[in-house]
Amino acid sequence: MNIEHILPENIEKRSFEIIEQELNGRYIPPMEKPIVKRVIHTTADFDYLDNLCFSENAVEKAIEILKKGAVIVTDTNMAKSGINKNALKKLKCRVECFMADADVAEAAKAKGITRASASVDKAALIQEPIIYAVGNAPTALIRLDELIKQNVIKPELIIGVPVLSLIHISEPTRPISIS
């Protein structure tokens, strides 16, 4: 294995060059390509080329929603930390993660549910346009699906890339439908 020595300021650029080479001319819709490349850059996982799915016009809708001053709700503080605060400020958006909130922990314990589910319940009270970014908790996606079916919420956008849970592995995998 050869180690390529790169100046710190060139690491990201070189990473994207390598990704582009690995794509080997593969077609990715132009609006989705920067996102796919960013996911691969962040994870070093080229399987996302085959596993990342976008709903029709999802990127265009996301841009439109962000321009309206959306609230992005994440299921981890790490995801919250990774969202560009300067971009949020320019767009008059904000990002929230309720997972560590005392009231969420209390609600989860009282209801016998996960903090992820209780966090979704808390986020359901937000009145602004909302984007859910779920990258860790399958129960957050399950709760979102329940609240959508009950017509309690109608999120503008859901980004769901949760870890696979052995508990939920037997449940059929299907996308959450938002019309």
Outline where the language-model segments fall.
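Short hydrophobic beta-strand that contains or immediately precedes a catalytic carboxylate
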Residues: 72-74
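Charged, compositionally biased N-terminal leader segments and the immediate start
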Residues: 1-30
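A short, well-structured juxtamembrane/interface segment
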Residues: 50-65
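N-terminal glycine-rich anion-binding loops that anchor highly charged ligand groups
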Residues: 27-41
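Short, basic, glycine/proline-bearing loop/turn elements
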Residues: 42-50, 105-107
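Single conserved hydrophobic/aromatic residue that forms the stacking wall/gate
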Residues: 167-179
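Conserved mixed alpha/beta catalytic, RNA-binding, or beta-rich assembly cores of soluble enzyme
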Residues: 76-147, 155-156, 162-164
